[in-house]
Swiss-Prot record:
HAMAP family: Transcrip_reg_TACO1. GO terms for molecular function: DNA binding. Transmembrane segments: none annotated. It comes from the Bacteria. InterPro entries: Integrase-like_N (IPR017856), TACO1_YebC-like_2nd/3rd_dom (IPR048300), TACO1_YebC_N (IPR049083), Transcrip_reg_TACO1-like (IPR002876), Transcrip_reg_TACO1-like_dom3 (IPR026564), YebC-like (IPR029072). It is found in: Cytoplasm. Its main location: cytoplasm. GO terms for biological process: regulation of DNA-templated transcription. It comes from Mycoplasma capricolum subsp. capricolum (strain California kid / ATCC 27343 / NCTC 10154). GO terms for cellular component: cytosol. This is Probable transcriptional regulatory protein MCAP_0598. Keywords: Cytoplasm, DNA-binding, Transcription, Transcription regulation.
Length: 237
């Protein structure tokens, strides 16, 4: 078969593993949001957000539906959400959101990854970020999007049009109202539709290639952990 075949097979296996991990993360988020706030996304902000996020990430419909059915059926499985803070190479601030059935395991694994990859798991950096509702999509004109938002008197923080992509930032509590207005525009596909943490100040630029590689390795290792849902940072990569 040759080395080329081995490389392709390894690449396909890695892609399949990432897809499986993404499906698992989405299922946990949807299950917990539905269990805690009800299975109707129209009245459950958290559920609406994670479903939209799953769709934007191309999570299969059956994964979404099974997670909601599990919550509706009174499944006893329980997960706890936590946010961990740390510092990476070049003093980059890092937030790690987890959803786990074993808090001690999650905390220990996160500390281990930081310690083994030139990071500090004891940094306090949450104040450098804010949680916002974020949307991104193509094939719509800025004027019509603004008109839809203004007609509904929806509060947003910013609207950016860049490379034919419209990006909207809004207070995280305004997620449902913004999404309701955007739905009237019949947007075909959202590139981003979720609540996420973003840096309050300008991102840190890392010019040294080795340092940048060290940081990317740390971020990748954190993202690969079973209990990790999201990893946020304030670096320019």
């Amino acid at each position: 078969m040759g080395r080329a075949h081995e490389v392709r097979a390894a690449s396909m296996a890695k892609t399949a593993a990432k897809k499986s991990a993404a499906n698992g993360r989405a299922a946990k988020e949807i299950y917990m949001a539905a269990k805690q706030g009800g299975i109707d996304p129209n009245s459950n902000l958290a559920l609406r957000s994670v479903i939209d996020k799953a769709k934007a990430n191309q999570i299969p419909r059956d994964v979404i539906e099974r997670a909601i059915k599990r919550a509706a059926g009174g499944d006893a499985e329980n997960y706890v959400s936590n946010r961990y803070e740390g510092i990476g190479p070049s003093n980059v601030a890092i937030l790690v959101d987890t959803l786990t059935s074993n808090v001690n395991r999650a905390a220990a694994m996160i500390r281990e990854v930081f310690n083994k990859n030139k990071g500090n798991p004891d940094g306090k950096v949450n104040f450098l970020f804010e949680d916002v509702a974020m949307f991104a999509f193509k094939n719509k004109k800025e004027d019509e999007v603004l008109e839809a938002l203004m007609s509904d008197e929806v509060e947003i923080n910013d609207l950016i049009c860049e490379d034919e992509t419209i990006i909207i930032y809004a207070p995280f509590k305004a997620y449902n109202s913004v999404k309701h207005s955007l739905d009237k525009l019949n947007i075909d596909e959202y590139l981003i539709s979720e609540i996420r943490a973003i840096p309050i100040d300008k991102r840190i630029e890392i010019k040294d290639k080795q340092t940048k590689l060290q940081l990317q390795t740390l971020l990748d290792k954190l993202d690969e952990l079973e209990d990790v849902q999201n990893v946020y940072h304030n670096a320019e990569l």
